[in-house]
Structure formats: C-alpha cells, structure tokens
C-alpha cells in the first residue's frame, strides 16, 4: 500500500473511534508523508496540532497503524517547517557506512537523543515526585556512586521519561565526553533481534555495554521475552560490575512485572526503587503556570484552575489540555475564559470521569483483602489460601476489564487462558451458591471501582 492508502485507512478507523469535533479539528487534514526507520512521519498544518496530537493521540494512532500495516511504527506529527528541518538533518547525515557502525553509533548522540525541554530546571516538584526527583538528581551528580540501579516506576505521563532525559542532560553537562545511551526496552529488543539476524552480536554488545550511563524506558515490555531477558541480564551485569550507571523505568515495581526472571528482578532491586504518583492540585497548578510562563502567555487564573480541577490523571493529559485550549482560543478568535475552557475540553473531560481499571488494581485490592502478596498471584503456589484469591482476582479481571483471556493469564504468571476460564466459571458458581460470598465479591468490586 502507498502512504496515501495507508493513511486513508487509518483515518477511516480513527474517525469511528474518536469524537467528531476532535477528528475534524486535529486529524482530518493530516497527511502521512513516509514511514522511515519504523517512524511514521505525519504532516499537520499547525504547531499546536503537532504538539497536541503527539501528547494525546499518539498511542491511539500507533494502535490503528499496527492493525492497518501489520507491524508497529511510532507516529510523529510535524508541521511543514519541522519537516523541512527534519529533511535537512537527514540529508546532512545520509552518508554511507557499514551496517555494524550504524548499530554502534545509534544512541551515542549526546544531548540530541534527549528532549531539550526535559531538564531538572523544568521539572515541577510536588509531593508525588519529590523523592524520585531527588534520587534522579543524586544519580546525575554522581553516576554509579549514589544508587545503582535507580528504578523509577509510575503510571503513564507522570514524568518518568522527563527525569530520565534530565539525568542524561545533567551527566553530559558535567561530563561532555561521557557515553550516555537512552533507549526503550522495545528498542533494545529490536536491536537484539537485528543483531541476531545480521550476525552482529559484537556490534550490539559494543553499543549497549561500552557506555557510562544506560537509561532504559518501559522495562516491563521485556516480560515474556526469554532471550531478550537473557541478553539484558548479561548487559546489566557487565555495566554494574564496571561501575556504570543504570536507570530503569517501568509502569510497575519489579515484583509486579509478570514473567520476569527472578535473577533480573533481584538485580532491579539492588539499588533504589522510587515511585511517582499523580500530581496533587497545587502541583498541577504549578505545572500549568510554568508552562504558560515558558510560552510567555497570559491566561486567567480561573481558566487554569478549571483545567487543574478537571484533569487529575497525569501531567501529559494536563499539558495536552492546555495546548488544546490555546489552539481552540486561537482558531475561534476568542479570549480564554473558564467558559471557553469548558467548551474546548468537553470532549476529553468526562463527568464523572471513571478511572480505567487495571489487573494490577484488582490484584492489589484482592491481595490486601485476603492477605496475599502481589507476587503470589504470579507464583506457582497452589495452596488454597493463595489459589482461591487468585481465582477471585481472575474472575474480577474478566468482569471489570476488557483484557483478553491470554492477557489476563499473562498477568497471573503466564497462566493458560483455559485456567482463566476455569477460575471464572468456578467463582461464578460459588457466587450463585453462597450469598455471603456473593456479598464479599461485590464489596471487592466496589472497592476496586472506587480506588
């Protein structure tokens, strides 16, 4: 399929999945320019649109594109000016080189691999991130001397990647010749597969082991990848033994990553584990105020207060809401007020806004109720005190989430989907037979929904 055909199909699906006003405003006039190095380069007409789409709809478009073309690419939105800069950079760097040199050099790009905005100076500190910020700064000041590894976990859009970029900037500012590599577990996996396919194991190891600081994002995605875990285990060991700093991020703590080898889990726990929680009201207001100061804008405090009260989930959505309001005000030619903010954000604010339930949420509530540790839900233990709560958690996972049977099984230690079906049938039968137990399960369900 041509880029035009691919994008036509993507837009058809997107139009059915998002609100009409959002689609018409932000996506309707976009254009897929090309797919380059697993990155889909997409043209938009306005810088506000590029920023807003990159912040709010990147994952949606990524999922749709995978369904359309059969493999995963990362969508990135650019204006005409940004595309021109991108093409100029590409032309300057487009010199022939041997494949293995490409693998080695990719990633050792100094500060170019980091978002220029993501520094410690621009990080807004609040109760939910004060400790992770302090730990990250300590690591950046003295790599491999303070905490090694540093493991940062928390939900999407809370600032994990910002802190990792800030560490990279700070290290290179103090040590310009340091070799700092920022990557994701998915990129690590893809490079590993490529090295096997091209018979270039030494080039791969040179890239990932001949460095001073490794910053690896979203480590949870190496679960179920046995060979990748094996390779990362040896990479981790070599870096740690040579006193090189390792910083890891995840959406959950090591003990809750299903199908992660115990030897890797224990190494992740060698250093310091810190968690980032959603920002409180004061932090949300500070983030918005800092953003408008950076952009040299004036927005009424009442409008900022409205955004801070309505968007409570994460920083990415908070900044995305502000970007959307600015774009809406400019396009409508109207001054920003609380009323305009409510109008601009009506598609992304749901009242009441219900939190999407995860399997981890269910395991935490059930585990607390029955005194079962989170890791025991994934363990092979079959004692009734663990096995029965595990079945209850599986039952609730089917009832309260949209996850597939295999995905639920995966989150319970890689169990087969038939095990999930059996657990659901057994608990459903017990609920019918025992009114006290039925009330117990209903109470658990209420607690999960009200978290």
Curated annotation (Swiss-Prot):
Subcellular location: Cytoplasm
Cited Gene3D superfamilies: 1.10.1750.10, 1.10.8.60, 3.30.300.180, P-loop containing nucleotide triphosphate hydrolases
Region (Domain IV, binds dsDNA): 330-451
InterPro entries according to UniProt: AAA+_ATPase, Chromosome_initiator_DnaA, Chromosome_initiator_DnaA-like, Chromosome_initiator_DnaA_CS, DnaA_C, DnaA_dom, DnaA_N_dom, DnaA_N_sf
One GO CC term on file: plasma membrane
MF GO annotations: ATP binding; ATP hydrolysis activity; DNA replication origin binding; lipid binding
Binding site for ATP: 157, 159-161
Entry-linked PROSITE patterns: DNAA (PS01008)
Region (Domain I, interacts with DnaA modulators): 1-71
Keyword Lipid biosynthesis: no
UniProt region (Domain II), positions on chain: 71-112
Region (Domain III, AAA+ region): 113-329
Major site of localization recorded for this protein: cytoplasm
Source organism superkingdom: Bacteria
Summary of subunit composition and partner proteins: Oligomerizes as a right-handed, spiral filament on DNA at oriC.
Functional description taken from the UniProt entry: Plays an essential role in the initiation and regulation of chromosomal replication. ATP-DnaA binds to the origin of replication (oriC) to initiate formation of the DNA replication initiation complex once per cell cycle. Binds the DnaA box (a 9 base pair repeat at the origin) and separates the double-stranded (ds)DNA. Forms a right-handed helical filament on oriC DNA; dsDNA binds to the exterior of the filament while single-stranded (ss)DNA is stabiized in the filament's interior.
Domains as described in the record: Domain I is involved in oligomerization and binding regulators, domain II is flexibile and of varying length in different bacteria, domain III forms the AAA+ region, while domain IV binds dsDNA.
Protein name in the entry: Chromosomal replication initiator protein DnaA
Organism: Staphylococcus haemolyticus (strain JCSC1435)
Gene name of this polypeptide: dnaA
